[in-house]
């Protein structure tokens, strides 16, 4: 057990008071629900989870719990003549979850200093080569000392991309996932999905794509599909749409993938063992939904992804709320008509079903804003309560309060929405409003107000002004 592993082991047992059962730590005290249901692997702890999956669902990576232990890699793992990359190796294994035996030769351990900008500061780095004279390096020794700068570029990387996979492997795969960061690309490639990293959501990898296209031509192979897979944030989603359209214009078969909302990227999912092929099906769906050109196309994507289990549902598309409805009687008759049509015998069964779905499904807009319930707030003294919602458009977002009366009747919800956000219209009916509100408020977080600066027995805490 390394020095770092011993420190992690000590910290986890101090925090959660685990009992060791075989190769596992169990019966730890969950910080979220207070029950002794916490568990993790004793020898190689990665993720600490609560066993009450439905009632609690607490899950946190060891790197986040013991954040202060993952900062000074050169001190904990000094380089030696036998291993000049000791700190870089340790960082990639412990902070990124990678098997470095599969990365040998793709990185080096270097030093970064900039006496003009950061006097007397130096850090070890993990450096990757993008092209001759072009490098990217990640700071690994207390990077917070350098403010917002956590990495450094050398050379012009415009149009370039980095990949763990060689050119021929990229050409011989069915699809290539395009991420922003190198560690995300490594996570995908080690999970069996060839990928490249653009280094920035503003960098369209034109030179790399040309290399792939030229090599495919030499090999006599069809070009692989490009799947844009940036982070699930505003910058990432904006670039996915932009680069997808550009790739299509450049005659690439293009689509998209997105990690789930919540802030986790591909490397985070890899460390949580959530990047297998079955997991990636959902990620592909999220991406395809994001680039859907019309709400009708988005509705059909959702219907098919759920295997037709729901005939009516609401969904968001381009910051607007829509309602999908499938008339099953009409669908059955239309499918029979298509199957009986001799001019359509060449269609596959799945294509016939898709054609019938297109003819018999209906999508209508029920709100020209995206509505996200945030939390419920209650004042027990005055018996007042409010539901907080985030109201979003492509250009801005704001928070607003709604009462129980507002959210339970279209006649009250519509005027309230219009009064808090200019031009925001609710056009759905009573059933659609109640369906949306019920599904979004049943497990909503609750915030209780405290109006006095005093010790509260209920929460076991002192409340101060500052």
Which residues fall in each region the model found?
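Terminal peptide-recognition signature
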Residues: 50, 92, 180, 188, ...
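Acidic beta-strand-to-loop metal/phosphate-binding motif
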Residues: 178, 221-235
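Acidic, metal-coordinating catalytic cores used for nucleic-acid/nucleotide bond scission
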Residues: 201-205, 230-240, 261
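N-terminal nucleic-acid engagement/recognition segments and initiation subdomains in replication
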Residues: 33, 92, 281-465
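Short, aromatic/basic amphipathic alpha-helical patches
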Residues: 212, 238-250
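Phosphate-handling DNA/RNA-contact segment within nucleic-acid enzymes
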Residues: 5-12, 116-222
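N-terminal structured subdomain of primase-like DNA metabolism proteins
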Residues: 1-75, 82-130, 213, 290-295
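Short, surface-exposed amphipathic charged segments that create phosphate/polyanion-binding patches used
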Residues: 121-124, 210-215, 264-279
